[in-house]
Swiss-Prot record:
The keyword Transferase does not apply. It is found in: Nucleus, Nucleolus. It comes from the Eukaryota. Keywords: Nucleus, Ribosome biogenesis, RNA-binding, rRNA processing, rRNA-binding. It comes from Pongo abelii (Sumatran orangutan). One of its GO terms (biological process) is maturation of LSU-rRNA. Residues 1-105 are annotated as: Disordered. Residues 142-325 form the Brix domain. This is Ribosome production factor 1. InterPro entries: Brix, IMP4/RPF1. Its main location: nucleus. May be required for ribosome biogenesis. GO terms for cellular component: nucleolus; preribosome, large subunit precursor.
Amino acid sequence: MAKAGDKSSSSGKKSLKRKAAAEELQEAAGAGDVATESGVQPPKAAAFPPGFSISEIKNKERRHLMFTRWKQQQRKEKLAAKKKLKKEREALGDKAPPKPVPKTIDNQRVYDETTVDPNDEEVAYDEATDEFASYFNKQTSPKILITTSDRPHGRTVRLCEQLSTVIPNSHVYYRRGLALKKIIPQCIARDFTDLIVINEDRKTPNGLILSHLPNGPTAHFKMSSVRLRKEIKRRGKDPTEHIPEIILNNFTTRLGHSIGRMFASLFPHNPQFIGRQVATFHNQRDYIFFRFHRYIFRSEKKVGIQELGPRFTLKLRSLQKGTFDSKYGEYEWVHKPREMDTSRRKFHL
């Protein structure tokens, strides 16, 4: 009986302590409300003295309340500083200092010696004599063959079919066990200008080989983040047969310039702007994001975009001279992670 009485008395003391803590919290909250309503803010030193640490408060409810107040005070100070800075900039007008640029990995990129200068004579000579010169001189028109690895599954097949609706004058062919070395001569004999091979692993597309015909080069990409049309939310209607516009972003080095020209050679020269379709290859930190959109003109001044799909991400693994040759091919560039990925601010495209 004595033990039961001790337990009841201890539980009664705990309940009294909880009530006292709750009353203290209510009084503190009421005092804060009165202070804010009267327009007089409590001094910061009284609320948060020097060396004050919220983590030292043992009462959980009290600690949570003080942390909430501290966050509110931080937001108010930040907003007040932003308003003050805005007023100062408006008062200075044109004499206001430029806005500070936030530091990002992109604008802190390590300078690459192979960065392309459009006015460089050497670059102009290379463009006039490389494998894509006949396309850019409008001597040839693109004709693309899209194929897969052996025994493709449904997801890879649907990706090929949807790519054929994005790239004009492209044809889907199922290999049926035929080796790539035998496919390439047949493509050249039938005047195909490019060959696209989509590889898969565990029923998921994971690689893309792009070979420019008849003389190369051949690029091998890792493919990830594949989304088919049905998997894209708020997508538009299926694309039309109009020739899309092509946008290439941030291909700045000599290697990136070659990859950009390779993508450009997949599409015909004169886009049909009436179709309002655009294919984008956006390079960011050596990842190439592919998107296919349609322009939506809401008014004379406002325009939006509507994604049509598919979408995927590419990362260059190697660039090989000539057509596909896995044994004796000469490689211009190969990605070596241990040697090349030594800095997060160094990019190759």
